[in-house]
């Protein structure tokens, strides 16, 4: 096979900055994929305005996972998250996923109905969680490593729940990154929303 064609096939199988060798063979679960990406891109600034690197987000997510575990939340359980300010709205879901749990987002703003429909175990209402979680270790030892096919999120809109797997979110995120032309060597500036190369 000509090298050019081989390179094009390899690039076509790449999801964002996750090369096929990383998501097809050695990473059977989400945790392994994220660990690999953090080793590779940990010091890269992701959100320039907040000076947040992948490593900082990764450490905070592990603290959140430890905090959730201390609250009795188990892997595969659902956690309802109310709207929060950025960057907490990004860090907290990663903490939930680090634990191996699933996030519930209720666009209908009917908390009681969402809890009943999804059997959510806890409702996270504000960003004080970040402060509470800071006393927990930045290393989380997973008891369960979610597979790419496991549920990652439930989005409730117009009383209908839409269920997404880790793989669904990975592919959708990749599609968005390609649409806005944001690549692995760039950071995102949020004020105003522009790409920084």
Give residue spans per PLM region.
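Short beta-strand->loop structural element characteristic of the AMP-binding/adenylate-forming
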Residues: 80-83, 89-93, 97-126, 163, ...
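Conserved helix-loop-beta element of the AMP-binding
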Residues: 119-122, 134, 138, 169, ...
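Conserved AMP-binding
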Residues: 82-87, 93, 151, 156-159, ...
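Short alpha-helical
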Residues: 87-88, 110, 171, 196
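Conserved AMP-binding loop of ANL adenylate-forming enzymes
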Residues: 81, 167-171, 177-197
